[in-house]
């Protein structure tokens, strides 16, 4: 456990064979001052990559977000031009670039997998899906806007399985994957 906003000094054995799974982020939007997204997500990426550099770690799996695409409901692919429009989305795109620069310094030796998950749900997330479930179960649910709002999502265990699979089956260079279930359902479909 460490604070990625500062230089990472952890007292554990580290080898070049280790893998870094970088999950560190300030992510709830809205909910934080703009500066918090940049300080944690960008400075954190710098410090994680510096730690990997210092110990010769060759593999990083970075969890970004679909937020670099900006707020829109049309289908996005990994080739879609990112157009982030929130501090969170901007900070995650910059963090991706920082990780990519780390990988490019030793192109043939380092692996970088970037995953861009949608809304992640599962036990303990206490976010959108948990609130939706308890609202419906308690008979207190109401639509907080449009019924046809689309939210791309993925179950946390499926995301982890995918990351482990990619780690074992990585191609050279940088791999970038959007991680959401197909099809993305409307909030009305999820409620039903």
Pin down the residues of each PLM region.
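NAD(P)H-binding glycine-rich loop region in Rossmannoid oxidoreductase-like domains
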Residues: 4-43, 47, 51-54, 69
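Catalytic helix-loop patch of NAD(P)-dependent Rossmann-fold dehydrogenases
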Residues: 39, 43, 73-121, 125, ...
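Short alpha-helix in the Rossmann-fold core of NAD(P)-dependent oxidoreductases
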Residues: 40-45, 61-64, 91-92, 152
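Conserved Rossmann-fold NAD(P)-dependent oxidoreductase catalytic core, especially the SDR/UDP-sugar
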Residues: 47-87
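Substrate-positioning beta->alpha
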Residues: 125-131, 145-168, 174-178
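Mid/C-terminal beta-alpha module of Rossmann-like enzyme folds, strongest
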Residues: 169-192
């Amino acid at each position: 456990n460490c604070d990625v906003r500062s230089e990472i000094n952890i007292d554990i054995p580290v080898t070049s064979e280790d893998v870094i799974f970088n999950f560190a982020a300030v992510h709830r939007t809205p909910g934080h001052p703009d500066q918090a997204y940049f300080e944690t997500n960008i400075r954190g990426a710098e410090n994680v990559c510096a730690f990997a550099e210092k110990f010769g770690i060759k593999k990083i799996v970075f969890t970004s977000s679909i937020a670099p695409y900006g707020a829109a409901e049309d289908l996005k692919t990994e080739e879609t031009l990112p157009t982030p429009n929130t501090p969170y989305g901007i900070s995650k795109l910059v963090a991706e670039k920082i990780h990519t620069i780390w990988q490019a310094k030793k192109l043939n030796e380092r692996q970088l997998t970037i995953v861009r998950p949608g809304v992640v749900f599962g036990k303990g997330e206490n976010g959108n899906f948990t609130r939706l479930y308890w609202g419906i179960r308690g008979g207190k649910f109401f639509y907080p806007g449009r019924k046809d709002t689309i939210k791309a999502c993925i179950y946390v265990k499926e995301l982890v399985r995918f990351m482990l699979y990619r780690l074992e089956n990585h191609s050279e260079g940088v791999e970038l994957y959007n991680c959401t279930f197909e099809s993305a359902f409307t909030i009305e479909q999820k409620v039903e």
